[in-house]
Amino acid sequence: MAQTNGELEHSKAETPEQLTNGNHPEETQEEEQNGGLFQISVKLPHEPYKIQVMVSSQEQVQDVRQSIVELPSTFQYTCFHLEFNGKRINDFVELSEVPDLKADSEIVLVEDPYTEKESRMHVIRMRELVGAAGDRVDNLQGISAGLSLHDSISEEAAAGETTEKEHSLSKYDIAGSPSLNTILPKAEAPLPKTVKSISLSPWNPVPYHLRQKGHLLYLQVTTNEGEQFQITSHVSGFFVNKCSNARFDPFPKPMPKKGSAHSLLTLISHLSPSFTTSFEALQEANNKKDLLTTFPFQNAIPNSPWLVAPPSSSVNAHQPDITRSQENYLISGVDNAETLRDWNEEFQTTRELPRDTVQDRVFRERLTSKLFADYNEAAARGAVLVAKGEVAPLNPTEDRDAQIFVYNNIFYSFGADGVGTFASEGGDEAARVAVGKDVVGIKAVNQLDINGLFTPGTVVVDYLGKRIVGQSIVPGIFKQREPGEHQIDYGGVEGKDVVATHPDFVPVFEKLSKALRIKKHAVWDKDGKRHDLEGSVETKGLLGTDGRKYVLDLYRVTPLDVMWQEEEGSDAYPHNMSVLRLELVESYWRHKMSQYVKAEVERRRAAKAVETASKEKSEENAESKEEGSEEKSEEALDQERVDISGFSLALNPDVCSGQIPQTDEEKEQWAQDEKEVRETCDFLRSKVMPELIQDLHDGDVGFPMDGQSLSQLLHKRGINIRYLGKLAQMSKEKGARLDALTLLLVQEMIARAFKHIANSYLRNVAAPFTASCIAHLLNCLLGADVNSNPQADIDASLREIYPEADFSFEKVTPTTLRAEIEKHVSTRYRYTPEPEWFNSLRHLQLLRDISIKLGLQLSAREYAFAKSQLPAKVPATNGASQEEGKKKKKKGGDSKSPARAASPEKPAVSIVPDDIVNIVPLVKDASPRSSLAEEALEAGRISLMQNQKQLGQELILESLSLHEQIYGILHPEVAKLYHQLSMLYYQTDEKEAAVELARKAVIVTERTLGVDSADTILSYLNLSLFEHASGNTKTALVYIKHAMDLWKIIYGPNHPDSITTMNNAAVMLQHLKQYSDSRKWFEASLTVCESLFGRQSINTATILFQLAQALALDQDSKGAVGKMRDAYNIFLSQLGPEDRNTKEAETWLEQLTQNAVSIAKHAKDIQARRLRRINMNTRTLGTKVQPQVGQSAPSASGASSANPSLDSRSIDELLKFIEGGDTSSSRTKQKKRAAASNPKLRGSKKSSA
């Protein structure tokens, strides 16, 4: 364990380097004032002989080591220790614990003798440094995993800023079809080559007699000059030996130049004259890239894009590299034992670490985060091997579904009902859901971090239709107990017939149940005997042989959704595991709590009124002034100080699941429990769901863009995915305003139904036919227009090798698949699609959603989903692109592999097996978030809300530092924080910091969530806003263009939130004096707005108002008068003649009509004045922050939102606000700020709702 911990710590230490070097100057000054950061010098054995390093007193010595290893001047050192005052410093102590170490102290770097492991690590590191390491082939992370496109887009932006050429939106087609090139990496120039190869020599491993002499490894290096050197890795360093390919003589070779060095890097620089120059060129090329785009992943699994460059393209070309297959040996030694870890022991000892001080908590959470990341990766790798049949089962005689496996100290089983545990709940379907819910339950318990309660490391992996559970092995779980003893110590034993209780489990389960709002309740075994349990009978407690208390099977921490199961007139749901979500229970608890507090306050007020009346007479002469203020503050305190200890809400998770109470009292209690659960279910249906629909209807929150963002939004609100159908019905009833939502909901149901159908076929298909199966099913769903009767493309010679394989997928036709999808949609979501639903599919978006749900990576080319899109006179199997005949020239990947082109007689289909390049596993993990980092962030937010700006910013920077230390830089949580922080800096007018953080948010979001995720679009839109606020408008437009291109791929045109973006673009174009282009974007925005909100809505009037001004600036005075009249008429009919919006429009209309001749000059003057003012405070320019999905957008400037009266200003001044003060105008969100900065929007909610 000690060794593993050391390794963990060592590999984690890379993040602080980023911290100390990568932060903004404000943070550094902040820390220096706190005395946290100081500089020390490091004395080196070779050139440059001394370097300066910035360190923090809280850092560990190994963090300093890591900083040294990553500095260009000290790359070559990997095997060394540090000394101070002649004494060796322990790597695992903090710098503050090193006696006498202070600013400007000198520590000495001393080179150590190598061990075999150190030598292997050195070779790996040097290969990476000199660019000799090819891409590792990886069965977990797919092609182009962790891709970021930011660099190529910012290059385009930089080119636009420096040249005087037209801006990036000048010829942009807003309604154009999507280009798949948007999400593909650009082909890059090859990096400078420093050496031809560095590999292990065929003379490995070292013979015994030479191990005694300190030989560790034998290497072979071929320099750029073509010379081959055989090199011995020795305890003292590296030297050229006398071996040849045929003769073994591993002793030093006399050399004209220096033939030995402690570091391999130094040795190669002696041997190859061109090495130093080419190595410098390589570093220069790498430095052009943003560090974050190449930084290796440590605490997260990188995102694998669904669309990748074809195998034939230069981006994914497969290069020869002899060492690629040797890397496993270099990483983990001869017997691979170095990577075997006792996962369970590591998890539990980490959980037992002290958590008394902040330092303790940082260390503990950092270790936890790294451990979970390592485990999730190892478990996912093993699960892939199990799914492929590469691991031998422990019980080979059992049925496939009942087989269990152990690989890399992780226990695997299938998420299927192999032994009949869930027979009464729905069999395999129930088992599949149960393991998914179990991970969610374990994640919740890990987050609570209850002292003395332990969970096994758990991961669920979906791969090739199979669901596989990987768990760390709990000591004692396989132990056969004595006769009469139960296998389980607490909870139901193998079903609910036998129930075990154990006094030791009561205190820890009590804490758990209190936190998860679970009620202590009675259950009865098969003999009718009562047992009082703290949790659900399904949740089990096991006393491990290590003496720890483990909680298992957490799939029932919330009650069943009783109303769903009892719904009249519905098809039977596939299983009985439909439970409520934890978020809903929490939301219901808050709802009941607020009712309790209100009732309590009312009761107090009533009591106070009586008390005050009696006191008034006796104290009439007391100081009346003070009394008034005191009474107010007391009343406020009274409201704040409502004692909630009297309030409790806990739900019984076992109601309606077959328990039979025995006595009348028990029956009465049970009925009460059931009533509470039914009220919770009703709360979901009557309050939560209608509120979500209303919020999206009113435009109060950001709108989902694809299946992923929709699911996240529902889950955040506590709504289960099974309610997609109900939501679609509610959304339909709201009419045209929510067409976009209905479309997304229906598309999500179809994609999920297809996923279930595809999985049922894939589960039994032999590996070589997987691509054929998927391609055929996709053709039946998406390619029926191209070929109404597609045939599965199966290699006949391969088929003969698998006589018993399942080829039932061949029989699927478009008609049978549609019927199957309708059946799934009906039973799973209780929704009936429109009769001709398959004719209105958005093919590209559905293909993307399905690919993400199944883990597909498709080759990029122009897919044809209609006959009209098929290319003329091209081998038909090649297909062509989604609605994009026009854009053919753009795709680099219409690549015809020889195999495809060779059989032109095949009928055309949309997708061929060769298009499915790879399938990646989908991992559901139980990693907890860092509570420490979240506490700091919350404290910072509260301080800012209380106007303590200095303290708030310090706390938020502290939270940023904790996030980066605990999660590493590349992690979705860190991306989220960068995003929030950039917004905060934007609001406090610190533009440079906002841009810097927004840029980081873009890159980390791209690499962890995907280059075309909804979060990535939002990150790009915010970055464009902040760039514009900093005066880089051309750059901002490049980012907007990229975001719009992404939007076309993931949603299509006319997304409700795109109104905000189009208005932002229009305002930016006005800023560049591109009046005619600006007008186009306002017109596009108006089109979407009218389609969503109707011609007579206030939102439409607001855009008409802005458009009229844009027309005036574009010297179209006649058009301007017409649009302003339309705006005036809408304001008049909706808000009445006295409303300030109506009056303002009227004044403008008069002016525009009177001055029709001189209008152009008038508008130009105003524009010039507006620009002068903008330069003073660009932030109120009228661009608007894009809200995140499901959240309302923050008001962009704290101060202005508090000032509601702008009435007295002149038209000239108001132009600034009107022309873009609320550029989103489609949304009535951000009411506060809109009312302040744009009087036209006042009162819009009631009229537009």
From Swiss-Prot:
Assigned keywords, A-Z: Cytoplasm, Repeat, TPR repeat
Chief site of localization: cytoplasm
GO cellular component, one term: cytoplasm
Domain (Clu) ranges: 321-565
Gene that this sequence comes from: clu1
TPR repeats: 975-1008, 1017-1050, 1059-1092
Protein name: Clustered mitochondria protein homolog
Composition bias type Low complexity, residue spans: 1192-1205
PANTHER family with a match to the protein in the record: CLUSTERED MITOCHONDRIA PROTEIN HOMOLOG (PTHR12601:SF6), EUKARYOTIC TRANSLATION INITIATION FACTOR 3 SUBUNIT EIF-3 (PTHR12601)
Biased composition (Polar residues): 1178-1191
One MF term in the entry's GO annotations: mRNA binding
Compartments in which it is found: Cytoplasm
Region (Disordered): 1-34, 610-638, 874-907, 1178-1249
Domain of life: Eukaryota
One GO BP: mitochondrion organization
Quaternary structure, from the entry: May associate with the eukaryotic translation initiation factor 3 (eIF-3) complex.
Family of this protein: Belongs to the CLU family.
Cited function: mRNA-binding protein involved in proper cytoplasmic distribution of mitochondria.
CDD domains linked to this entry: CLU-central
Gene3D superfamilies: Tetratricopeptide repeat domain (1.25.40.10)
Signal peptide (residue range): none
Ranges of biased composition (kind: Basic and acidic residues): 613-638
